Amino acid sequence: MAFEDFAEYGSNTINSEWTTITLSSAYARNIAIFAEVNSFNDGTPSSNRKKNSLAPVEIRLRNISKGNTETSTPGSFDIKIQRPYGYSSTHPSETVSFLAIAEGTWDLVDGSRLEVGIYDRIHTKNNKFQAQLFSTSFSAKPGLISQVQTTDGTDWITLRHKNVSSTGFQVAHQEDEHQNKQGSKEHLIESLAYLAFDDGF
């Protein structure tokens, strides 16, 4: 199968306000979004953290829609840049690249395989890992990326992996250091997505 049959990629300019990106296609299956900031337009550092324009950032997503294949209504999603607690919440415009890809297991024309999964994180505590199995095993340990797909919790959040194998992996979320140091603090349940792929994809 050709990659373009179940996925598309692009770029856009976004900031710390929500932006809606409309895709070029509609999809029969639910889609996952993977996005990264590919520019660095932060301002001058300051010793006053609240005024510091140089800050860590994370992409937040919401309202991911696969579109409607019957009406040819394309898919879409909302995206913004988020800064951690204690920094100014306003971030300047940055270039972001994204991949929209349909859920499922896909065999490409070159023989490589990839799998896209969408699931809810069941643990709400910081740094508490949960196991996630692939739908079918890979022949070797695959490459793996994942991203939070919702913004049910408004605190800054990022994901960590460990014990990646041919059959699955473990994943945990981390909030910023202010929230994360409170080991008992909980984050609302979010929808997560992963993309696992053969070496050489």
What does each model-identified segment do?
Residues 1-201:
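Extracellular receptor-binding modules and their adjoining Ser/Thr/Gly/Asp/Asn-rich linkers
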